[in-house]
A protein has these predicted regions:
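Basic- and hydrophobic-enriched, low-structure N-terminal and domain-boundary segments
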Residues: 1-150, 154-162, 167-169, 496-497, ...
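Short alpha-helical interface patches
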Residues: 49-53, 65-116, 220-230, 274-281, ...
Length: 603
């Protein structure tokens, strides 16, 4: 039996009793003495006594018709009354918004303090992606909004980095560090907690590990992703560099060159230095269509050897343009690669020490240090983020059956300054199942819209937690609208003065924002608003890091805990120089020395 039919039968089953009762009344009317209606009604009581003397139902046709008709009429009355019933919601006539309390957040908190994401002083979210009750499952993506000085680092970033000792849910961190101060403050704690610490510094290249995106190219699609990230986050300066045709042509050029380097160059030449040299060696002449640059000759020889080569196919499409067009493309390409003319940048990206593909294998903290005033080198960070997410997703799928053994938390402070991560709106919707999460930290939601346009709303919708630390204007209005309205009681007192004085009292209900725009704009600096999907919002105290059990290991508590990045990198490189790889080969020479020669050597 279908569920709908079963539900219908159960709902109408009680009306069989009314079929019986109305049938008995029909039987009483039929058995009453008299030949017309008035006489029947006069003796109806006698008929009832006879009819109800026997409890068995009557199967007389007249009695059955009366029973069915009476029950049907009653069912129709109930149906009509239900349809036209007035709907009252007492106390919530204008809105049911309210602040959440301890009982609201309790199902989402892990009993073990270390197994939680710290959101406020009283609210936390378990790191468990598969809780016993699936209804309480939430992704670990957090959107943090707070203006300058609202404590985004102190009240959110640092408390969550101090959650680095969980044994049930080991976690790696990828942290953007504007100004480079955070690594010095928390680095010592991470080291003593068993973390590998990696650092990419785009402010001071001498205090950075090396990053080479070519080391993470494993297929043609990886080449396309790298080119796309480079195009999205750098600017060509040719007169037509912003036009779609020119960008597509430039994309073909980069794809061909990077594809050539990836598949044909020796390992030590797989870097941006080689790419820059190939661009510098490229040339197109409008007055000499037969002219061939050194790069043209390289691709011609490659085509003779392998006509179906990926790089050759891309370069042939690039050559379809006229000489003047190619000259414009080369100018734009040279301008886009201008940052690599700086020797320090080339040296930074000639080798790789970050080991991005292993961050989900063991506990690692990767600090991405960037300037908060200059975005010149932020395209490097965008490349790191883009490659990292794609590498971890592929590694989770190919090696670990879809889930990384170590959860990777990306805490992206000043997210708007990183640059655009291609397809981030799609990636953030799929990384949860791979044990990856992102905490997006902004000064205003308009920053997200400025970079990701229409995709900004998709990104924010995929964050199950929103933490609002402070804000004014449009930010405050958006938060106020999302919080909704509550129903309040209004009491008015009036007085009319004339020949006679009269007084009046008026009670009514009104709708009021749970927190108005001006209340949000003037919110106490120690307070914050937290929204968790499917839960009432919370108006709580910001997290006090001095009460965290591991606060004593930060340099905030004791200057002796300051982490010296320079010394750390120097020690790592010395250690690396002393280690001989098992794969390293040596030449062995067998020399036959005489006794006299041996004596001379010993002396």
């Amino acid at each position: 039996m279908k569920p709908e039919m079963k539900k219908l039968i159960i709902a109408n089953l009680p009306y069989l009793l009314f079929v019986y009762l109305f049938g008995k009344l029909g039987q009483a009317y039929r058995l009453a003495e008299g030949i017309d209606l008035s006489q029947k009604l006069l003796h109806f009581a006698d008929g009832c006594a006879v009819a109800f003397a026997n409890a068995a139902p009557s199967f007389n046709t007249f009695d059955l018709l009366i029973g069915v008709a009476g029950a049907a009429a009653l069912r129709l009355m109930v149906y009509c009354k239900g349809k036209n019933a007035k709907k009252y919601r007492k106390g919530v006539e204008y809105g049911s918004a309210r602040w959440g309390g301890p009982k609201d957040i309790a199902p989402y908190i892990d009993p073990n303090f270390d197994n939680n994401i710290l959101l406020t002083q009283t609210e936390r979210l378990t790191m468990n992606n598969r809780p016993k009750d699936p209804k309480t499952a939430r992704n670990k993506n957090v959107l943090v909004i707070g203006g300058s000085g609202s404590g985004k680092t102190r009240f959110f970033v640092k408390p969550n980095l101090m959650q680095c000792v969980s044994k049930d849910y080991p976690t790696s961190f990828v942290i953007t560090d504007p100004k480079g101060s955070l690594i010095g403050e928390v680095g010592q704690l991470l080291i003593r907690s068993g973390y590998r610490v990696k650092v990419l510094n785009t402010i001071n290249f001498s205090k950075s590990m090396k990053y080479n995106p070519f080391r993470y190219l494993h297929s043609e699609k990886d080449v396309l992703k790298l080119v796309n990230t480079l195009i999205c986050n750098t600017k060509g300066e040719g007169e037509k560099s912003a036009e779609d045709f020119w960008v597509k042509s430039e994309r073909l050029f980069y794809t061909a060159l990077i594809g050539y380097i990836w598949q044909e160059a020796p390992e030590e030449e797989m870097n941006f230095t080689t790419l820059l040299e190939m661009i510098n060696a490229s040339e197109a002449r409008e007055d000499d269509p037969e002219f061939q640059s050194p790069v043209d000759m390289m691709f011609e020889r490659l085509e003779e050897r392998d006509p179906d080569h990926f790089a050759v196919r891309q370069y042939k499409k690039f050559l379809l343009s006229a000489g003047k067009t190619r000259s414009s493309i080369l100018i734009s390409a040279g301008a886009r690669m201008a940052p690599f003319d700086i020797r320090e940048v080339r040296e930074l990206m000639e080798d790789d020490e970050l080991e991005l593909d292993t961050i989900g294998d063991e506990k690692t903290a990767l600090f991405l240090i960037m300037s908060d005033t200059d975005t010149t080198f932020n395209f490097i960070l965008a490349m790191v983020q883009s490659q990292l997410i794609n590498l971890l997703c592929d590694r989770a799928d190919d090696k670990y059956g879809g889930r990384l053994p170590v959860h990777v938390r990306m805490i992206l402070d000043e997210f708007a300054n990183i640059g655009q991560i291609p397809n981030f709106d799609k990636l953030i919707a799929t990384i949860r199942s791979r044990e990856i999460s992102a905490s997006i930290i902004l000064q205003s939601q308009s920053q997200l819209k400025a970079i990701y346009k229409d995709a900004a709303e998709i990104i924010s919708d995929n964050c199950d937690c929103t933490l609002f630390l402070s804000g004014r204007g449009k930010n405050a209005k958006e938060i106020s609208d999302v919080l909704g309205k509550e129903t309040i009681d209004s009491y008015n007192q009036s007085e009319n003065r004339g020949a006679q004085t009269s007084h009046g009292l008026n009670y009514q209900k009104l709708g009021k924002e749970l927190m108005s725009q001006d209340e949000i704009a003037t919110m106490d600096g120690g307070k914050c608003i937290l929204q968790v999907r499917g839960v009432r919002p919370f108006f709580s105290e910001k997290y006090d890091i001095t009460r965290h059990p591991r606060y004593k290991y930060l340099s905030d508590a004791d200057k002796k805990n300051y982490f010296d990045v320079d010394r750390y990198l120097t020690a790592l490189r010395r250690k690396r120089q002393r280690v001989v790889s098992q794969e390293e080969t040596f030449d062995l020479y067998d020399i036959d020395l005489s006794d006299e020669d041996m004596a001379a050597v010993n002396e």
